[in-house]
């Protein structure tokens, strides 16, 4: 997905979010919004990356779209919960990405699909890419990832 000139919403302000912000800003989005239950944590992260690109922070309840991409980096899916954001942020042309993954849709992706999102992705690809990068660091060879991801999805009965 092309991220240049796109409006990106990043849910969560923990370690996973922090690791994603630099690479997201490197793609020159129109704006990156970090939203969190505690806005102070989002503001802290936005402050750290303020010189890297257009970034702002807000509380979940303050969010107003439209966004082109929503990334869920919260741990909510682990407990079957969904971040408390408005379903009005979801529309048919939005891309939704949950850093979590499982055999079926994550609770967040299931919720987004219910409200009309059609492009839905999970974090399995990120997991495999991280493993490939680690392998490259230790072995000097970067393995392909597409076939591994496809095979994992097939073997685990995933979409």
PLM segments and residue spans:
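NAD(P)-binding Rossmann-fold cofactor-contacting core
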Residues: 27-49
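Rossmann-fold NAD(P)-binding glycine/threonine-rich loop
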Residues: 86, 94-146, 151
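Short glycine-/small-residue-rich Rossmann-like dinucleotide-binding loops
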Residues: 72-76, 100-101
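Glycine-rich adenosine-cofactor-binding loop
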Residues: 5-25
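Rossmann-fold NAD(P) dinucleotide-binding segment
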Residues: 66, 77-96
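Short acidic low-complexity segments
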Residues: 52-67
């Amino acid at each position: 997905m092309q991220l240049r000139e796109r409006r990106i919403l990043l849910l969560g302000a923990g370690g996973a979010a922090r690791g994603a912000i630099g690479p997201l800003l490197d793609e020159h989005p129109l704006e990156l919004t970090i939203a969190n239950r505690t806005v102070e944590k989002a503001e802290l992260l936005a402050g750290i990356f303020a010189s890297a690109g257009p970034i702002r922070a807000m509380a979940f309840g303050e969010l107003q779209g439209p966004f082109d991409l929503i990334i869920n980096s919260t741990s909510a899916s682990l407990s079957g919960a969904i971040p408390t954001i408005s379903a009005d942020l979801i529309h048919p042309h939005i891309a939704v990405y949950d850093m979590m993954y499982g055999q079926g849709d994550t609770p967040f992706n299931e919720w987004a699909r219910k409200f009309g999102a059609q492009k839905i992705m999970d974090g399995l690809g990120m997991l495999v890419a991280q493993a490939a990068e680690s392998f490259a660091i230790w072995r000097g060879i970067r393995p392909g990832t597409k076939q591994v991801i496809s095979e994992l999805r097939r073997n685990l009965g995933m979409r």
